UniProtKB/Swiss-Prot annotation:
Gene Ontology, cellular component aspect: chloroplast thylakoid membrane; photosystem I; photosystem II
Keywords: Chlorophyll, Chloroplast, Chromophore, Magnesium, Membrane, Metal-binding, Photosynthesis, Photosystem I, Photosystem II, Plastid, Stress response, Thylakoid, Transit peptide, Transmembrane, Transmembrane helix
Annotated residues for binding of chlorophyll a 3: Q130, E197
Residues that, per the record, bind chlorophyll a 4: N200
Family statement: Belongs to the light-harvesting chlorophyll a/b-binding (LHC) protein family.
Organism classification: Eukaryota, Viridiplantae, Chlorophyta, core chlorophytes, Chlorophyceae
Binding site for chlorophyll a 2: H90
Designated name of the protein: Light-harvesting complex stress-related protein 3.2, chloroplastic
Length: 259
């Protein structure tokens, strides 16, 4: 009988989870103990990699997870979701910026720019200071409204554990804005379309950086630079033909020599 009681007591002790205690002193000086709060176990690295590998945007030639800087080694799924939201947003802004560069340089006299005292001219990197204030004010308000809507739809209340994190039921990038009804209902088709958007956004981020660098170095507009490159290549090809025929070579204009 006594053995059975001892056995049950020992079994109960084994099933009770251990809790760490911290010895503290009360105001009266007596020594007491308080239980330490239990912390959640960190998400395993394998879970983060598996989650990332199944996201839209994994594409050739990088069929696996492309993470040369090793960000995922110390990241959580919450971090990955926030980074994906940032990538989608920056890609969309870059696509608009790349389009705005080339269109803005072709519509330099368009009255929407509120530049009544003179014309907007030159590379797009110098248009900011030439365009009237009446254009930037409504644009700033529109950006503020759009960003406020994005925060309201996707971001958690910044208190407690919700600081700097997305809502649990929010799909990064999905703001519910689909006026043309192009969003596929099939999950696989949706993933393909999301991958296309990500790839176009990634290309646009590289393109807008190249646009800015090219205009800073050569001080020419995008299409003007492209036309000059074609002109130079045409002259060089013509020179090769003239050499083969024993004809005088067409000289390369000075403005094309530096291209």
């Amino acid at each position: 009988m006594l053995a059975n009681v001892v056995s049950r007591k020992a079994s109960g002790l084994r099933q009770t989870p251990a809790r760490a205690t911290v010895a503290v002193k009360s105001v009266s000086g007596r020594r007491t103990t308080a239980a330490e709060p239990q912390t959640a176990a960190p998400v395993a690295a394998e879970d983060v990699f598996a989650y990332t590998k199944n996201l839209p945007g994994v594409t050739a030639p990088f069929e696996g997870v492309f993470d040369p800087a090793g960000f995922l080694a110390t990241a959580s799924i919450k971090d990955v979701r926030r980074w994906r939201e940032s990538e989608i947003t920056h890609g969309r802004v870059a696509m608009l910026a790349a389009l705005g560069f080339v269109v803005g340089e072709q519509l330099q006299d368009f009255p929407l720019f509120f530049n009544w005292d003179g014309r907007v001219s030159g590379p797009a990197i110098y248009h900011f200071q030439q365009i009237g204030q009446g254009f930037w004010e409504p644009l700033l308000i529109a950006i503020g409204v759009a960003e406020s809507y994005r925060v309201a739809v996707g971001w958690a209340t910044p208190t407690g554990t919700g600081f700097n994190s997305l809502k649990d039921d929010y799909e990064p990038g999905d703001l519910g804005f689909d006026p043309l009804g192009l969003k596929p209902t099939d999950p696989e088709e949706l993933k393909v379309m999301q991958t296309k958007e990500l790839n176009n956004g990634r290309l646009a981020m590289i393109a807008i950086a190249a646009f800015v660098a090219q205009e800073l170095v050569e001080q020419t507009e995008i299409f003007e630079h492209l036309a000059l490159r074609f002109e130079k290549e045409a002259i060089l090809e013509l020179d090769d033909i003239e050499r083969d025929l024993g004809l005088p070579v067409t000289p390369l204009p000075d403005n094309l020599k530096s291209l």
